[in-house]
Every structure is written in structure tokens, then in C-alpha cells.
Amino acid sequence: MSDPQMSMAATAAVSPSDYLQPAAATTQDSQPSPLALLAATCSKIGPPAVEAAVTPPAPPQPTPRKLVPIKPAPLPLSPCKNSFSILSSKGNILQIQGSQLSTSYPGGQFVFAIQNPTLINKGSRSNASIQYQVPQIQGNSSQTIQVQPSLTNQIQVIPGTNQAITTPSTSGHKPVPIKPAPVQKSSTTTTPVQSGANVVKLTGGGSNMTLTLPLNNLVNTSDIGGPAQLLTESPPTPLSKTNKKARKKSLPVSQPSVAVAEQVETVLIETTADNIIQAGNNLLIVQSPGGGQPAVVQQVQVVPPKAEQQQVVQIPQQALRVVQAASATLPTVPQKPSQNFQIQTTEPTPTQVYIRTPSGEVQTVLVQDSPPATAATTSTVTCNSPALRAPHLSGTSKKHSAAILRKERPLPKIAPAGSIISLNAAQLAAAAQAMQTININGVQVQGVPVTITNTGGQQQLTVQNVSGNNLTISGLSPTQIQLQMEQALAGEAQPGEKRRRMACTCPNCKDGEKRSGEQGKKKHVCHIPDCGKTFRKTSLLRAHVRLHTGERPFVCNWFFCGKRFTRSDELQRHARTHTGDKRFECAQCQKRFMRSDHLTKHYKTHLGTKGL
């Protein structure tokens, strides 16, 4: 007797004109209908099958419920003729208007509002089963949504049969209000979901759920063969400690839920109780912001990658836009190929270069040559000369600078008139040479065969190996270079003679060694042609020669300064501008000045005042 009753109840649920509503017996009906007599007879024999499936074992009720046929209630007029009613197993009627349907989403999905959310779960009935049969607007098949509350919080969606089984936990009995999405003007058509035993299951508690989706159900047929892409959005607010714990607990639970032997992708979705997830070709999420505002439907299409990797899709709670299936995927960011820079150190030929700073410290720079095959892949590093000649370097800094300079190729030096001289390390000889100090533009390096050229490639200076003790090369013109080289070679002692250091190599000093008288009146003369100036001290002669060559060996070591000077006293006077030292004081007015000539000029003002 229970089978005819269930079939009749299903027939009444589908028909919009005739349906049943449970109510108590009234005295207005004089004669009971045949359906009422049949229900009364079944109640005498035993409890109905519908109530036996819904209610748990409980004490028998004294009075049975009677089903009385009533007239259908008038339905309100709607702009479209797509409204229908839903009859639950408990007799509650849910009316869905055509204006609440939205079928503009890809895949034929539509969202409707349930006006009676209290039917989802009851605290007293943990095993209650509510089944809704919703016919499609266009199509032969129907979608069945079955909600089964139990102790575990699981949502199982079966796209093959268009069934969604929801089993919320008994701890939270909050209804889920769903407001209709804004109606979009489009044709009301639905497309069936792909058939097959593709199971989509959500497990976990709290506000975090783990979605396990088969890859063959998530791949769009139009994007087969394209690159794997994934849409990732970060939530605006951080998760609480309870949510993090719930997420950690929900991950291992979802692993045994997959029983099919196929490639499965795990997607972690951070959602709340107000979100409804519907699986198919696309991932549909309905978000209700609250405050009387309409709900927003967000549709995300997940395309799995080629390799077996776990991808994460995070959807923010305040998302107020609808992501269409065509624009859901984002282009992948092209990655630059890795560049390998290799410096081959086999068979090294290091060359030591000694650099003496104006303060007297000696720095050792090791320049290591690499084979020509690796020279093309090794980047060239340019080093500035003031950094190489920075004074007051500790032992550790010397080692660090030497290690860095091993990778450098050109060592440019500041030449006179502002030009740059490139000292190529490839031209340095690897064999051990005689230790010799050569002063090239104020930088003293080891005497090895090098060729110094300017930026234009013109050869300006060639230094040869000589056995002299100290050799000073300060000229850049060919005549000056040849003159100084001849002087150095002429001053070199013979193998059998005793060598001594020469303080000055000017013509007067060379000729004065052979003369015996008037040594006190000897003057140092400039050897530059058409000059002929004489000086009392060799230091003054050297400073004068720097004016001809343009050499400025004295460099200011203050940050962001780097000014160069010909004489050391000029550098000391310039350093007072940085320190603010005013060592010259007027004896009459106690004013202080940085330079002595400024004090002399100021002192003349006092003499002029006294004369008046």
C-alpha cells in the first residue's frame, strides 16, 4: 500500500494544478473523498512509508494525519510562464517564480530562491530526508536535489544524474538564505551536464572545505590541447586560528573519499555557510553579502595542468563580479630561460698587480685570465679607479676586493684631459716578471708588458720590462715617453757597477753629477721642450711637470666627491671644505678662515681702517 501512495504523492508534486497539503480534518467536508478513505485505510494497517522513511523511531502518534484534497491556490502572474511549485515530503509548498530563474550562465545552470529555509535541517530529526523534484524549463530530464542531514558535514554532487546530496552537521542548524541573482535578458535554455560517474565531494567542517574533482569533468572541451591555466584570487581578510585548524583537519578526510582510479585534482576553496557550490563543467559559487542586497553568482572554470599537481583556488568573500567561462582562465606568465654564466678556472694564469695609494698602502690585485671560449659568456665588469685607490683599507677588505677583481677584464684609469685609459688584463704576461714599480698617472702598478690605449683605440703608451728600481712615466706624448725611457735606460747601472737611487733626472742633475763645484747653487730644470723653468726643490719640479701632463694623482676620498688635484696641498685645502676646519684666525677681530690667502686679504682691511 505504500507504493501507490508514494506514486500518487509524486504525481501531485509534479502537477501544478492538483497537489496535496497535510491538514487536520474539518467539519465542512460532509463526504470524504476516495483518496482520503484510502489514506485512512493505510493508516489503520500501518504507518505510511513516507513517514517511516523520514522520522526516526519514536513513540506512536495517537491520531493519524489525513490528506484532504483542496483546490490549488492561485499563483501570482509573472512575466514569463516558467513558474512552478515544489512539494516536499512534509507537505510544505515552495513556489518558484520565473523572475527568480537565471539561465544565462554557461552550462545551463540556474539559481532559484527557497522561501522556506527551515526545511533544511531540524534538530529533532537527524535522519530526515527531503527530496525536491524540479523540472527543467526546456528539456526532457529533471534535476533532483536530495538533502540528507547526518553527523558528517558532506556535500556530494553527482553530475551524471544531476543530483546533489547535502549532509550538513547537526552542530550548526543555521538556515542558508539564497537571494535571487539579478535577472539577465537572455534565452531560457539549459544544457544537460556531462554524463558519467563523475563524483564531486566536499568534506570538512567550519568555513573551509576541500573539493575533490576528477580532471575529466573539469576540462573544457573547447580548450583541449591548450596550455594548463589556473585562476587564483587571494582573500582580503586573513583566516582565523579555528579556520586554519579546520582546514588542516579537512585535507586528510578528503583523500579516502575518491574511489575511482583516475587522475584527481584537489582544490581548496575558502568559503562560508552562505556559499553554495554546484559542480559540472564549471564551478558555481553563490555569495550573499547580506543587508538586503541581491546575491552574486561567481563562476570559476578550473583547467587542470598536464602534470599531477595540487592547485589552489582561493575566492574572496567580498567578490562582487561574475567570472564568465570564456574569461575565467588567465594567461600564464612566460618565464625567461635560465642563463648560465660559467667561469672556467682550469689552468689559471693569474697576474699580480700592485697598486700603491697616495697614503702609502699597497694593494694586491689578482687578475685571472680565462680561455677565449668562455670569454663570450662571461660578463665584463668595469671598475672605477678611485675605488681601487681608496685609502685606509683593512686586511679583510683587501681580500674581498681582490676576490672581486678576479672576474674583471678592463681596469680603466683616469688619464689626463679626462680621457679613459683601458688596462686590458688579457695583455698582461703570466710569467713572473722583475718586481718593478711604475707610476702610471698616479697609480703605481707592477712593471709588466702592457699596452695602454684610449677609448678611441689609439695607442698612447707602451711599457716595457726594465730592471730599474723606480721608473716614473708621466708623459703621454711620444716624444716625452721616448725621452723618459731613454733617461731610465741611461741611468741604469751596468752589471758590474753599484746602483743607487736618483732623486731627480732633470738635465742639470745629470750633468751636475759629473761636475765638482757649486753643488749648492744647482737648480732643477724642466725637461719639457720650450719651457726651461727651474726650481729649487725636486717636489716643485714634479708638481710643475704634472701641469704639462695633466696628471692629478691626489683624489678626494669623501663620498660623492672624487675631485682630483695636482698637488697635495691643494687636496688638503679642499678637504677643509668638507670638514669645515678654519685654522687661520685674525689676531684683531678673531675671525677664522680656511685659507691663508683669505686671512691675508682680510688683514688688509684692518690696515686700511687704521690709515683712515
Swiss-Prot record:
Function: Binds to GC box promoters elements and selectively activates mRNA synthesis from genes that contain functional recognition sites.
Keyword terms: Activator, DNA-binding, Metal-binding, Nucleus, Phosphoprotein, Repeat, Transcription, Transcription regulation, Zinc, Zinc-finger
Main location: nucleus
Gene Ontology process terms (BP): circulatory system development; embryonic organ development; fibroblast proliferation; in utero embryonic development; multicellular organism growth
Compartment(s) of residence: Nucleus
Keyword Zinc-finger: yes
A single GO cellular-component term on record: nucleus
Source organism of the structure: Mus musculus
Assigned protein family: Belongs to the Sp1 C2H2-type zinc-finger protein family.
Region (Disordered): 166-195, 226-250
Domain notes: The 9aaTAD motif is a transactivation domain present in a large number of yeast and animal transcription factors. In SP2, the motif is inactive.
Modification sites for Phosphoserine: S78
Listed name of the protein: Transcription factor Sp2
